[in-house]
Swiss-Prot record:
A Pfam family per the record: PEPCK_ATP
Residues holding ATP: 212, 231, 247-255, 296, 332, 448-449, 454
UniProt binding sites for Mn(2+): K212, H231, D268
GO MF term set: ATP binding; metal ion binding; phosphoenolpyruvate carboxykinase (ATP) activity
GO cellular component, one term: cytosol
Organism per entry: Citrobacter koseri (strain ATCC BAA-895 / CDC 4225-83 / SGSC4696)
Biological process (GO), any one: gluconeogenesis
Cellular location(s): Cytoplasm
Keyword Nucleotide-binding in record: yes
Principal place of residence: cytoplasm
Protein name stated in the entry: Phosphoenolpyruvate carboxykinase (ATP)
Subunit and interaction comment: Monomer.
Pathway assigned in UniProt: Carbohydrate biosynthesis; gluconeogenesis
Residues reported to bind substrate: R64, Y206, K212, R332
Length: 539
C-alpha cells in the first residue's frame, strides 16, 4: 500500500533531500522480492532458506553495541534521566552534546539523501492511550522487514492520518570519522534526542538497535506516568491468569512464555497499567542457536515465509545449521507474532499479572532451580537482576560471565532502577501477585538445567502446586525451596545435592553471595535501599 501524502518533499523536514523514491509500508511479498534481488551486495542481500524464511548477515555487529549509545543531555533529560556519569549505578546512558548530535544527524541525513528509501510507520505499544507512533526510515529492505515484523502493524485506516511521535533514521552504512575529537567510543553510534524525538543509527547493521531503541524510549515515558515498563515476556491461561517472565537475553523468556497450554501476549517488552499487561511489540525475536523442532516446536514452526533469520549458517541446499555458532552465539529470528498459533487476539494485552517470574541463568551453579520470594526479596532480586551474561548478545562477550543488570534490563533503563521497582511493586500489591526466582542456568554437575525440568517448574508455579508445596530454606541466600514438585527430579531442587560435597557448594555460594552484596551497595544510599539489604544473601 502506498500513501500518496508521503512524498520526498516531506522528508526535507527531517533534513533528507533529493530522495529518488519512497517505498512506503511495503508488503511482505515486496520485501521478499527486494531482499532476494540478485543485484544487491554485501549485508543488504538476503538468502532464501529451505524453511521459506530469508536469512541475512548483520556484519561485525551481531548484537547491540551498548558502548556506542548516547542521549542528548538537555532541559528535557538533564534531571530525569539515569546518566552513566552520575551516581554509582552502571548503565549505558552516555550524555551527548547538542553540537555533536547535530553533526551525527548531518551524517545520517546525508547518507539517506538521494537514495531510494523504505519507510515503515508502526506502533510501539498495544494500548492506544500510551502507544508511540514511530516512523522508521532506512535504505535497506531487510531492516524495513525487521521493523515490520517486530512492531505493531497499523490497519490501513490508521495510516491515513498517521503522525509520528518518534522518528528512527537508520544510516547503517555511514560512520563518524570525528569520533575521537568528540570524545565518543568509536565511529559507530546509536543516539537519541528525546526533545526532537529522533533516534539515529550509524555504523551498525544490527536490527535489534531499532527494537531496543524504542524500548528505551518507552522505558523513559511510561514510568513517569505510573505505568510499569518491563523487560519481560507474558502469557495468559484459560482462566485469564496472567504471568510475566523477567530475564536477560538467553535466560528463557521467549522459550518459556511460548507454551501450547497458554496464549502468548508477547515475548520481550511489556507495560502494566490500570487495565493490565500489554505488549509493546507486534512480533517475536527468538534466539535460534541449537534450536530443535523437538525442544521448541512453536518457535521452529514460526520460521517460515515472512520470518527473517539473522547470522545463521545456511548450507548450499538452503538448509540451516542451527548448531553452528561460528558467526555468533546470538543467532536470531524475527517473525510477526501471529506466526505463533496460540496468541492473544486481536490485541496483545490481557488482565493484571498474578505470577511474576524472575529468570536467571546462574553460571556458578549455586542458586536453586526455583524458589518462592518474599515481598522484600522480590524487590532485592529485581534490583539485583543477576544472571550470567551469555555469549554473543553483546559484542565482545564469548564466555558466560556473571553479571548484575538492574530490573533484568539495565541496558534499556532510562530512569533510575528504583523508579521501576516502585512502579512494579505497586502493581503487584494491587493485583496480589507472587514472585518466584527460577534458575535456567547450571547446577553442580556442570550441566544446564533441562528445558523439560524448567517447563515442569513453570507449570507448578502457574497451576498453584508450588504455592501448596512444603518448603525448606537454602542457607546463606534464605530462599524458600519446594521439597518436591510434579514432573521434576527431586534431587535437583536443592542445588547442594548436585555437588560432590556440601563444602563445594558452600565455597561457590560464598563467592556468589559476596558479588550480590557488593553489587547492592549502590542502592544503600537511601533508607528504602538500606532496608532491603536483609533480603539478600548473608555472609
Amino acid at each position: 500500500m502506498r500513501v500518496n501524502s508521503l512524498t520526498p518533499q516531506d522528508l526535507k523536514a527531517y533534513g533528507i533531500n533529493d530522495v529518488q523514491d519512497i517505498v512506503y509500508n511495503p508488503s511482505y511479498d515486496l520485501l521478499y522480492q527486494e531482499e532476494l534481488d540478485p543485484t544487491l551486495e554485501g549485508y543488504e542481500r538476503g538468502v532464501l532458506t529451505n524453511l521459506g524464511a530469508v536469512a541475512v548477515d548483520t556484519g561485525i555487529f551481531t548484537g547491540r553495541s551498548p558502548k556506542d549509545k548516547y542521549i542528548v543531555r538537555d532541559d528535557t533529560t538533564r534531571d530525569t534521566l539515569w546518566w552513566s556519569d552520575k551516581g554509582k549505578g552502571k548503565n549505558d546512558n552516555k550524555p551527548l552534546s547538542q553540537e555533536t548530535w547535530q553533526h551525527l544527524k548531518g551524517l545520517v541525513t546525508q547518507q539517506l539523501s538521494g537514495k531510494r528509501l523504505f519507510i515503515v510507520d508502526a506502533f510501539c505499544g498495544a494500548n492506544a492511550d500510551t502507544r508511540l507512533s514511530v516512523r522508521f526510515i532506512t535504505e535497506v529492505a531487510w531492516q524495513a522487514h525487521f521493523v515490520k515484523n517486530m512492531f505493531i502493524r497499523p490497519a490501513d485506516e490508521e495510516l491515513v492520518d498517521f503522525k509520528p511521535d518518534f522518528i528512527v533514521m537508520n544510516g547503517a552504512k555511514c560512520t563518524n570519522p570525528q569520533w575521537k575529537e568528540q570524545g565518543l567510543n568509536s565511529e559507530n553510534f546509536v543516539a537519541f534526542n528525546l526533545t526532537e524525538r529522533i533516534q539515529l543509527i550509524g555504523g551498525t547493521w544490527y536490527g535489534g538497535e531499532m527494537k531496543k531503541g524504542m524500548f528505551s524510549v518507552m522505558n523513559y515515558l511510561l514510568p513517569l506516568k505510573g505505568i510499569a515498563s518491563m523487560h519481560c515476556s507474558a502469557n495468559v491461561g484459560e482462566k485469564g491468569d496472567v504471568a510475566v517472565f523477567f530475564g536477560l537475553s538467553g535466560t528463557g523468556k521467549t522459550t518459556l512464555s511460548t507454551d501450547p497450554k497458554r496464549r502468548l501476549i508477547g515475548d520481550d517488552e511489556h507495560g502494566w497499567d490500570d487495565d493490565g499487561v500489554f505488549n509493546f511489540e507486534g512480533g517475536c525475536y527468538a534466539k535460534t542457536i541449537k534450536l530443535s523442532k523437538e525442544a521448541e516446536p512453536e518457535i521452529y514452526n514460526a520460521i517460515r515465509r515472512d520470518a527473517l533469520l539473522e547470522n545463521v549458517t545456511v548450507r548450499e541446499d538452503g538448509s540451516i545449521d542451527f548448531d553452528d555458532g561460528s558467526k555468533t552465539e546470538n543467532t536470531r529470528v524475527s517473525y510477526p507474532i501471529y506466526h505463533i498459533d496460540n496468541i492473544v487476539k486481536p490485541v496483545s494485552k490481557a488482565g493484571h499479572a498474578t505470577k511474576v517470574i524472575f529468570l536467571t541463568a546462574d553460571a556458578f551453579g549455586v542458586l536453586p532451580p526455583v524458589s518462592r520470594l518474599t515481598a522484600d526479596q522480590t524487590q532485592y532480586h529485581f534490583l539485583s537482576g543477576f544472571t550470567a551474561k551469555l555469549a554473543g548478545t553483546e559484542r565482545g562477550v564469548t564466555e558466560p560471565t556473571p553479571t548484575f543488570s538492574a530490573c533484568f534490563g539495565a541496558a534499556f533503563l532510562s530512569l533510575h532502577p528504583t523508579q521501576y521497582a516502585e512502579v512494579l511493586v505497586k502493581r503487584m500489591q494491587a493485583s496480589g501477585a507472587q514472585a518466584y526466582l527460577v534458575n535456567t542456568g547450571w547446577n553442580g554437575t556442570g550441566k544446564r538445567i533441562s528445558i523439560k525440568d524448567t517447563r515442569a517448574i513453570i507449570d507448578a508455579i502457574l497451576n498453584g502446586s508450588l504455592d501448596n508445596a512444603e518448603t525448606f530454606n537454602l542457607p546463606m541466600f534464605d530462599l524458600a525451596i519446594p521439597t518436591e514438585l510434579p514432573g521434576v527430579e527431586t534431587r535437583i531442587l536443592d542445588p547442594r545435592n548436585t555437588y560432590a560435597s556440601p563444602e563445594q557448594w558452600q565455597e561457590k555460594a560464598t563467592a556468589l553471595a559476596k558479588l550480590f552484596v557488593e553489587n547492592f551497595e549502590k542502592y544503600t544510599d537511601t533508607p528504602a535501599g538500606e532496608a532491603l539489604v536483609s533480603a539478600g544473601p548473608k555472609l
